[in-house]
A protein has these predicted regions:
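Catalytic toxin/effector domains delivered as secreted proteins or via bacterial secretion systems
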Residues: 49-276
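Seven-transmembrane-like multi-pass membrane architecture, highlighting hydrophobic TM helices
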Residues: 13-16, 20, 28-29, 34-36
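Ser/Thr/Pro/Gly-rich low-complexity linker/stalk segments immediately outside membranes or between
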Residues: 29-53
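Helix-loop boundary elements of multi-pass alpha-helical membrane proteins
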Residues: 1-22
Length: 277
């Protein structure tokens, strides 16, 4: 009679091994699930890449046909490459530099509108005055407006479950770094008269910690920008909390004066028909 194999594994051991494997797979799955849900911010917008490509195509064909030769496929890839397979709390401006180069756009002098806590009002104005531009009216801002995105160093996929919150998790996340860099570039390129729409219904109309106060105002160049015209807008029927004579606006005036940029301010209830003073 032939010898039985010495390495035969008993059925009991096989069951134990199978059970152990299932437990290991379950643990890995749970750890991956916890990893994807570890951030406090909203996850990547569904169909992010398709939205970027679609918005780019719409902008270059319909909104600004002068940019029709822009390669939207390359832009989409550069956008994804900026954050895919990277630590979402360690994103740098260098990551976005290829995207910025592909989306270079010249804004005519005296057509730049900045805003702080008045996004909807600013966009209402540019929807009527199509020759004026907020950041979201440029190709770069138009594509990313209202979207969320992030990846992770351990995968080539986007994280649709959670992304870092700029305050609760980390400031150097994909979205925050993008908008800071885009805002810097937008202000840096401005020339002529620059307009800013501020919320006069808030107690702190000019907030030095806002994107306008911490990024845009300090990147306006006096050799190109002759004046900053501020519109302090109050809600219709509301009680004005700030006007052109308060300490908040005086601080803004002081900053522009130090930068040798002329400053004018006007307050109004609701949006004016024209921002020109």
């Amino acid at each position: 009679m032939a010898d039985e194999p010495c390495c035969r594994i008993s059925k009991k051991v096989q069951i134990c091994l199978a059970f152990g494997l299932l437990v290991a797979v379950a643990v890995v799955g749970v750890l991956m699930w916890l990893h994807l849900y570890k951030w406090n911010g909203q996850g990547t917008t569904e169909h992010f890449a398709d939205i970027i490509l679609g918005r780019c195509s719409n902008y270059t064909r319909i909104v600004q046909p002068a940019l029709r030769n822009v390669d939207c496929q390359k832009i989409q890839e550069a956008f994804k490459d900026a954050f895919i397979s990277k630590n979402p709390c360690n994103i740098t401006e260098e990551d976005y530099r290829p995207l910025m180069k592909l989306t270079t756009q010249t804004i005519p002098c005296s057509k730049t509108i900045l805003w702080s806590k008045t996004k909807e009002m600013a966009h209402q104005y540019t929807r009527v005055h199509r020759d004026m531009f907020t950041l979201e009216d440029t190709l770069l801002g138009y594509m990313a407006d209202g979207l969320m995105w992030c990846g992770d160093s351990g995968t080539s996929e986007m994280n649709y479950r959670s992304c870092p919150h700029w305050k609760k998790d980390c400031p150097n996340n994909p979205v925050s770094v993008f908008w800071k860099m885009a805002s810097h570039r937008f202000a840096d390129a401005a020339c002529g008269v620059v307009y800013v729409i501020l919320n006069g219904s808030l107690s702190n109309t000019f907030d030095e910690n806002s994107t306008f106060g911490s990024v845009e105002i300090i990147n306006l160049h006096p050799e190109k920008v002759q004046a900053l015209h501020a519109w302090v807008i109050h809600d219709v029927g509301g009680v004005p909390s700030d006007s052109c004579m308060t300490s908040s606006i005086n601080k803004l005036k002081s900053i522009t004066s130090q930068r040798k940029i002329a400053f004018r301010c006007q307050h109004n209830t609701g949006l004016p028909h024209s921002l020109r003073m």
